[in-house]
Curated annotation (Swiss-Prot):
PANTHER family: 39S RIBOSOMAL PROTEIN L20 (PTHR10986)
Gene3D superfamilies per the UniProt record, alphabetical: 6.10.160.10, Ribosomal protein L20
Name of the molecule in the record: Large ribosomal subunit protein bL20
Classification via InterPro entries: Ribosomal_bL20, RIBOSOMAL_L20_CS, Ribosomal_protein_bL20_C
An example molecular function term from Gene Ontology annotations: structural constituent of ribosome
Top-level taxonomic group: Bacteria
Gene name of the encoded protein: rplT
């Protein structure tokens, strides 16, 4: 039976990890054992933060809508409730965009929400 030499495989695996760790500080980009841990941890952070990004954007949109609604003498919750009663289905991302870039259109939406609540 032939002897199995694993040098090529190990080198390839190490190179792959060190390539992923490129740009990391100090030993994290140079020493395989440290780089491996850093790459694993980076992957965990990336996985977690891909989910958190969605939550954070929703929070941002709600904060922007709330600020714009309050400029028109209405709270966020009453505004959203009014839109639902007026059967206006615009998601929060678009509402936040309108609130930032088209104040006149947002004011019109607020008026429709107020009318639906009255």
């Amino acid at each position: 039976m032939a002897r199995v030499k694993r040098g090529v495989v190990a080198r390839a695996r190490h190179k792959k990890i060190l390539k992923q760790a490129k740009g990391y500080y100090g030993a994290r980009s140079r020493v395989y054992r440290v780089a491996f841990q850093a790459v694993i941890k980076a992957g965990q952070y990336a996985y977690r933060d891909r989910r958190q990004r969605k939550r954070q954007f929703r929070q941002l949109w709600i904060a922007r809508i709330n600020a714009a609604a309050r400029q028109n003498d209405m709270s966020y919750s009453k505004f959203i409730n009014g839109l639902k009663k007026a059967s206006i289905e615009i998601d929060r991302k678009i509402l936040a965009d309108i609130a930032v870039f088209d104040k006149v259109a947002f004011s019109a939406l607020v008026e429709k929400a107020k009318a639906a609540l009255a």
